[in-house]
Amino acid sequence: MNTPSRIQRSRAKGWKAPDGAVYVGRPTRWGNPFPRDNEGVAIECIPMGLDGEDPHDRAAAAADLYRRWLTGGKVNEMIAAFLPVIKGKPQTLRQIQRDLGGKNLMCWCPLDQPCHADVLLELANSPADRE
C-alpha cells in the first residue's frame, strides 16, 4: 500500500482528482478555520519565532493553530482575540482516522507550503488510538 499524501488541487484544463482522494479545503468539515491572512495567525508567528509577514511562515502558523484546535492544545488568549469565531467542534481523532486514514488528501495549498492537510495526514495515519 502506498503512503497517503497531499495533493494540490488544480483548475488546469484536463486535471482530474485521483480516485479516492478526499478534498479537505475550507468549505468542508475538514477545513482549517484559521485563514493564513487572519491577523491572529500573523501574531501567532511571533512566539513561534516566525515572520508574520512571510506567507510560508503564516501557513506554518495556521497549520499549527489547526493542530492545536484538533488536539485540544491551548491558544494564547491575546491571539485568540484576533482569530475568527469558530462555530462547532473540531473532528475527533477517531473520526479523522476513520474517515481519512489511508487516503490521499487534497487542498489548494502549494505543496511547498505548510498546510492543514499535512496535519490531517499525520493524525489520520498515526497508529496511536487506532481502533
Report each predicted region and the residues it spans.
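Catalytic phosphate/metal-binding cores of nucleic-acid and nucleotide-processing enzymes, i.e., regions
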Residues: 1-131
